[in-house]
UniProtKB/Swiss-Prot annotation:
EC number from the UniProt entry: 2.1.1.-
Protein name: Methyltransferase CPUR_05424
Organism: Claviceps purpurea (strain 20.1) (Ergot fungus)
CDD domains associated with the record: AdoMet_MTases
Function: Methyltransferase; part of the ergochrome gene cluster responsible for the typical purple-black color of the ergot sclerotia. The ergochrome gene cluster produces several ergot pigments including the yellow ergochrome secalonic acid and its derivatives, as well as the red anthraquinones endocrocin and clavorubin. The pathway begins with the synthesis of atrochrysone thioester by the polyketide synthase (PKS) CPUR_05437. The atrochrysone carboxyl ACP thioesterase CPUR_05436 then breaks the thioester bond and releases the atrochrysone carboxylic acid from CPUR_05437.
EC main group: transferase
Record lineage: Eukaryota, Fungi, Dikarya, Ascomycota, Pezizomycotina
Length: 317
């Protein structure tokens, strides 16, 4: 199927809509999901007798993972809230086996119920209304289909001084971004969900089978690192979305390790929505980083969270 379905995004383009230069930097500065990441998802899908017909890549940005998904699935739906991102995805990926939508993740009434074999949601679900989003995703999944959710992006550096400056840059950048938004509370809640356990995806037992997997890869004791400024209060904090029946898995994988020079560290920081401010408001902090790192390579790893669940044989009211 080949089509472009228009919609009206309702969240600030200051967070989501990015140009081609940003996405080129994103591909350079963010972790490359290793083969083991996709192998785990496909293996889970196969073990639960999933089909490889249609996958919906939600909150896809410019579709950095869509090409990989197309290698396994006959049809890939690429959706994002920002029209600019979807246009870039279509220009890069073409129309052979791809369909494009401009839409919030929560808005999916145009997708026929039970028509999707897998929903693939990477680095996006924390921005959404959790209950509304999960009902929308469950509605489009066929019984036995797979919900595959993941988050990765913030680095953990082995050098404690580098990590400390990196944390300060992230928090300072978040403060700048929050000042530009009409609804900063929404972004605060999103950042809060990414801190620690990556608290997303309430799995209603009527919609998803018991035994869902919540996988921590290379996870530090404190969990994931969010840029949430410590002085900013989140007025409505989510309760834990982990069910008693969920299977908790902790593993280490060498494929998520890295060694960065100063240029690569800069590319990584510039891959965040506040990245453009490195050359302006954040320049004093960046000079601290340059003076500390100089010509060294800094080792570290990418913590990752993967959530895998199977659609139950039930309707969504």
């Amino acid at each position: 199927m080949e089509s472009t379905i228009p919609a009206k995004p309702d969240f600030s383009n200051k967070v989501f809509a990015k140009d081609e230069r940003f996405w080129l930097n994103y591909l350079e500065g963010r972790p490359t999901a290793p083969k083991s990441f996709f192998d785990r998802i496909y293996r889970y899908h196969e073990e639960h007798r999933g089909h490889f017909g249609t996958v919906h890549d939600v909150g896809a940005g410019n579709g950095p993972y869509a090409k990989e998904l197309r290698l396994k699935f006959s049809h890939v739906i690429v959706s994002d809230i920002a029209a600019e991102n979807v246009t870039l995805a279509q220009e890069r990926l073409g129309n052979d086996g791809f369909q494009y939508r401009v839409s919030r993740l929560e808005d999916a009434d145009d997708i026929p119920p039970g028509s999707v074999d897998m929903v693939f949601a990477t680095n996006v679900l924390h921005f959404c209304d959790q209950d509304v989003a999960m009902r929308a995703l469950a509605r489009q999944l066929r019984p036995g289909g797979t919900f595959a959710c993941a988050s990765f992006g913030s680095a953990y550096f082995a050098d404690e001084k580098v990590q400390e400056i990196y944390t300060r840059i992230g928090r300072a950048g978040a403060r700048l971004l929050l000042k530009t938004l009409d609804d900063p509370e929404r972004l605060l809640r999103a950042m809060d969900r990414t801190d620690g356990t990556y608290n997303v995806a309430p799995l209603d037992e009527k919609l998803f089978m018991p035994g869902a997997q919540r996988v921590d890869l290379n996870m530090p004791e404190r969990g994931m690192l969010s840029p949430l400024p410590p002085e900013m209060e989140v007025t409505e904090r989510d309760e834990s979305h982990t069910r008693p029946s969920d299977v908790l898995i902790q593993e280490e994988e060498d494929e998520w390790k890295f060694s960065m020079n100063i240029g690569q560290i800069k590319a990584h920081i510039e891959s965040f929505p506040f990245g453009k401010d490195v050359a302006t408001e954040l320049s004093p902090l960046w000079r601290e980083m340059e003076n500390l790192v100089q010509d060294r390579r800094i080792d570290g790893h990418w913590p990752a969270k993967i959530i895998l669940a199977t659609r139950a044989d039930a309707s969504v009211e």
